[in-house]
UniProtKB/Swiss-Prot annotation:
The keyword Transmembrane is assigned to this record: yes
Glycosylation sites recorded in the entry for this protein: N24, N38, N54, N97, N181, N301, N499
Name assigned to this protein: Hemagglutinin
Location in or out of the cell: Virion membrane; Host apical cell membrane
Species name: Influenza A virus (strain A/Udorn/307/1972 H3N2)
Transmembrane segments: 531-551
Gene Ontology cellular-component terms listed: host cell plasma membrane; membrane; viral envelope; virion membrane
GO terms, molecular function: host cell surface receptor binding
Side Extracellular, residues: 17-530
Record membrane topology: Single-pass type I membrane protein
Subunit structure: Homotrimer of disulfide-linked HA1-HA2.
Keyword hit for Lipoprotein: yes
Taxonomic lineage: Viruses, Riboviria, Orthornavirae, Negarnaviricota, Polyploviricotina
Gene3D superfamilies found in the cross-reference section: 3.90.20.10, 3.90.209.20
Length: 566
């Protein structure tokens, strides 16, 4: 019984132990940083996955689904290709003299006139698209001895046979087709684009019935170039009831140069010229609808915001667009390293500093203080260190965007079948560029993330060192981001430490005196729980021993009888 009384006395002493923060003559001050229950994983140079409190996605992975009509002027081709609009296909007459920043060709576009081919289709399409206009000026060509304005039932304009409005089909007059030799100087100060063609009859009979001569020839020259085309007579696959074809060619006449056209048959003559302009207009194949909205960047999938530095929506873009990369996601850290707060801290609910874990619920700052003193507990943010970190992180996203946003458009690359090797080379170059940019993007983000985490850790350490220098020997570093203050420190005192007005000398004597009065052995908080549980276990064991001894004594005296049956 004496043993039990002694153990109970020890247990009470343990419970009455003077723990840090419970003594009115001391206080505990901890420094910590913001934490969230579920952070975001980012990549750094040294770590493939590190959790931070906040991060911003840098890759735009979706479009609006529509092409915005502002600030770029969008011209919807509807059912016309750009070349059909250029030639003057009857169903494309509405595009005459139109202008655009971006011409949108649709998959449903079709030709509805005389069947033709353009040997250098991609180059002509690109040239006209970049000019951004179909402005056409008629000129007074003189074609003597031939019939003009030929037409075909395959190219009806209303109920009548027609032809391309920008071309003039010449054929024999009576039974003659004289040699034509026409010149047209360029006396203006801009480039002129002339579109002309050569007719390829399907039979020799068709050739002579239209042009008299068994074989025609067309030569178009300038001071810088010359093209001579001999018609290829022969049947071709039937298109819109015709097995003959027209080949479309084009010539650019510079200022001061002269256009010379010579032919003895098969000439599809120009009616004038297109005024060429230099600019950044372009063309794009897309079936996305055109909507009333604002977006600087357009892809075939639709417009996309350009508030992110990277995108993986489409390689083809127009406008000021994010750089295309292969990655679906790249996250830029805009917060500090995240260490979620431990939910339980032993029997006494002790507070802990940044070395052990972060603090959840700090909504007014990234860094702050928690304290325990005679007036209770409290928490406050340190706005100065928070602002110092935010100021350095702010603008990081904008700087990355400035480094990566393209101020030009990436157009479609088209090549004819005979340029297959060039197309393969172009594809290889483009794929290599994308690989390099994807690698550079990942490296850039990893470097920025490393800098952000190091920066926020540095600000935490600066705040801790600033507090240490204020307290000096008036407090002891507890090794977990906390200080044990050896003098009475009420809320006003704690506030002076936070705002940097703490006077070390005022509390020096009291702190030194309290240090010497501390008990010889101060149990660390980690061992208190162990001692309590061990004391409790020993007490229970001794109680069981006493109870068992009492039962055996009672049985021996006959007060209790125990029968064991087998």
């Amino acid at each position: 019984m004496k043993t039990i009384i002694a153990l109970s006395y020890i247990f009470c002493l343990v419970l009455g132990q003077d723990f840090p923060g419970n003594d009115n003559s001391t206080a505990t001050l901890c420094l910590g940083h913001h934490a969230v229950p579920n952070g975001t994983l980012v990549k750094t140079i040294t770590n493939d996955q590190i959790e931070v409190t906040n991060a911003t996605e840098l890759v735009q992975s979706s479009s609006t689904g529509k092409i915005c009509n502002n600030p770029h002027r969008i011209l919807d081709g509807i059912d016309c290709t750009l070349i059909d609009a250029l030639l003057g296909d009857p169903h494309c007459d509405g595009f005459q003299n139109e202008t655009w920043d971006l011409f949108v060709e649709r998959s449903k576009a079709f030709s509805n006139c005389y069947p033709y081919d353009v040997p250098d289709y991609a180059s002509l399409r690109s040239l006209v698209a970049s000019s951004g206009t179909l402005e056409f000026i008629s000129e007074g060509f003189t074609w003597t001895g031939v019939t003009q304005n030929g037409g075909s039932n395959a190219c009806k304009r209303g109920p009548d046979s027609g032809f391309f409005s920008r071309l003039n089909w010449l054929y024999k007059s009576g039974s003659t087709y004289p040699v034509l030799n026409v010149t047209m100087p360029n006396n203006d100060n801009f480039d002129k684009l002339y579109i002309w063609g050569v007719h390829h009859p399907s039979t020799d009979q068709e050739q002579t019935s239209l042009y008299v001569q068994a074989s025609g020839r067309v030569t178009v020259s300038t001071k810088r170039s010359q093209q001579t085309i001999i018609p290829n007579i022969g049947s071709r696959p039937w298109v819109r009831g015709l097995s003959s074809r027209i080949s479309i060619y084009w010539t650019i006449v510079k200022p001061g140069d002269i256009l010379v056209i010579n032919s003895n048959g098969n000439l599809i003559a120009p009616r004038g010229y297109f005024k060429m302009r230099t600019g950044k207009s372009s063309i794009m194949r897309s079936d996305a609808p055109i909507g009333t909205c604002i977006s600087e960047c357009i892809t075939p999938n639709g417009s996309i915001p350009n508030d992110k530095p990277f995108q993986n929506v489409n390689k083809i873009t127009y406008g000021a667009c994010p750089k295309y990369v292969k990655q679906n996601t790249l996250k830029l850290a805009t917060g500090m390293r995240n260490v979620p707060e431990k939910q339980t801290r032993g029997l006494f609910g002790a507070i802990a500093g940044f070395i052990e874990n972060g603090w959840e619920g700090m909504i007014d700052g990234w860094y702050g203080f928690r304290h325990q003193n005679s007036e209770g507990t409290g928490q406050a943010a340190d706005l100065k260190s928070t602002q110092a970190a935010i100021d350095q992180i702010n603008g990081k996203l904008n700087r990355v965007i400035e480094k990566t946003n393209e101020k030009f458009h990436q157009i479609e690359k088209e090549f004819s079948e005979v340029e297959g090797r060039i197309q393969d080379l172009e594809k290889y170059v483009e794929d290599t560029k994308i690989d390099l940019w994807s690698y550079n993007a990942e490296l850039l983000v990893a470097l920025e993330n490393q800098h952000t985490i190091d920066l926020t850790d540095s600000e935490m350490n600066k705040l801790f060192e600033k507090t240490r220098r204020q307290l000096r020997e008036n407090a002891e570093d507890m090794g977990n981001g906390c200080f044990k203050i050896y003098h009475k420190c009420d809320n006003a005192c704690i506030g002076s430490i936070r705002n940097g007005t703490y006077d070390h000398d005022v509390y020096r004597d009291e702190a030194l005196n309290n240090r010497f009065q501390i008990k010889g052995v101060e149990l660390k908080s980690g061992y208190k729980d162990w001692i309590l549980w061990i004391s409790f276990a020993i007490s229970c064991f001794l109680l069981c021993v006493v109870l068992l001894g009492f039962i055996m004594w009672a049985c021996q005296k006959g007060n209790i009888r125990c029968n064991i049956c087998i």
